[in-house]
């Protein structure tokens, strides 16, 4: 699929396999997600704009590169997006943070918004939306649609797992938004869960049921 980037680095795939195991503890699951998120941050930010500035080293003055423009914004889809957000902030500590609160209606599987908070000057910022699972795609589509109302410079979507159904939904609604994922699993089940998947990411991150 166009505009879909599979992050197949061996370290990412190894850690993802460990996360999939049903006997992985909450602590292990959370730690592994943090580590994968740091590795994925490297991939998703590789085309960020740069500018030259003058830097004085201990030996001489030189021209060196820094990231150009307003601070990047990482947008977490609550609640599970927090798991990816923490790892990415380790790599990009200067990023601004936004939150979108969405829950999935268990009957219709549609996304319902209950919270929305973003930094200022969004029209001058690049945005990375994070959520561990791109399953039905409804939450991702709703989040991106809401963000587009603020006219950011660009939007990317990062997830741990997705499936053909979720990707199709996302690409139909937002073909201009690149999706970065560690795996494309087989399918959705009738309850909207990815198969073979890794279960409910939010429950496994926070130790809830």
Swiss-Prot record:
GO terms for biological process: UMP salvage; uracil salvage. It catalyses: UMP + diphosphate = 5-phospho-alpha-D-ribose 1-diphosphate + uracil. Pfam families: UPRTase. This is Uracil phosphoribosyltransferase. Catalyzes the conversion of uracil and 5-phospho-alpha-D-ribose 1-diphosphate (PRPP) to UMP and diphosphate. Its cofactor is Mg(2+). It comes from Variovorax paradoxus (strain S110). Gene3D superfamilies: 3.40.50.2020. Disulfide bonds: none annotated. Signal peptide: none annotated. Binds 1 Mg(2+) ion per subunit. The magnesium is bound as Mg-PRPP. The keyword Transcription regulation does not apply. One of its GO terms (molecular function) is GTP binding. Keywords: Allosteric enzyme, Glycosyltransferase, GTP-binding, Magnesium, Nucleotide-binding, Transferase. PANTHER family: ADENINE PHOSPHORIBOSYLTRANSFERASE (PTHR32315), URACIL PHOSPHORIBOSYLTRANSFERASE, CHLOROPLASTIC (PTHR32315:SF4). The lineage of its organism: Bacteria, Pseudomonadati, Pseudomonadota, Betaproteobacteria, Burkholderiales. Its EC number is 2.4.2.9. Allosterically activated by GTP.
């Amino acid at each position: 699929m166009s505009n879909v980037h599979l992050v197949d680095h061996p370290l990412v795939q190894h850690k993802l396999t460990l996360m999939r195991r049903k006997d992985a503890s909450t602590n292990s699951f959370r730690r592994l997600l943090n580590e994968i998120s740091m590795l994925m941050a490297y991939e998703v930010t590789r085309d960020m704009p740069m500018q030259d500035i003058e830097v004085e080293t201990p030996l001489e003055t030189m021209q060196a590169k820094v990231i150009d423009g307003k601070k990047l914004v990482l947008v977490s889809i609550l609640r599970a997006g927090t798991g990816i957000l923490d790892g990415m902030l380790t790599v990009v500590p200067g990023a601004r943070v936004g939150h979108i609160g969405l829950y999935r209606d268990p009957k219709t599987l549609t996304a319902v918004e209950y919270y929305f908070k973003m930094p200022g000057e969004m029209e001058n910022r690049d945005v990375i939306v994070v959520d561990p699972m791109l399953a039905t795609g409804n939450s991702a589509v709703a989040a991106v649609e809401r963000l587009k109302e603020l006219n950011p410079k660009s939007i990317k979507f990062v997830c741990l797992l997705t499936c053909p159904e979720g990707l199709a939904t996302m690409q139909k609604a937002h073909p201009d938004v690149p999706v970065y994922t560690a795996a494309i699993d087989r399918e959705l089940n009738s309850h909207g869960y990815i198969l073979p998947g890794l279960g409910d990411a939010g429950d496994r991150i926070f130790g809830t049921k």
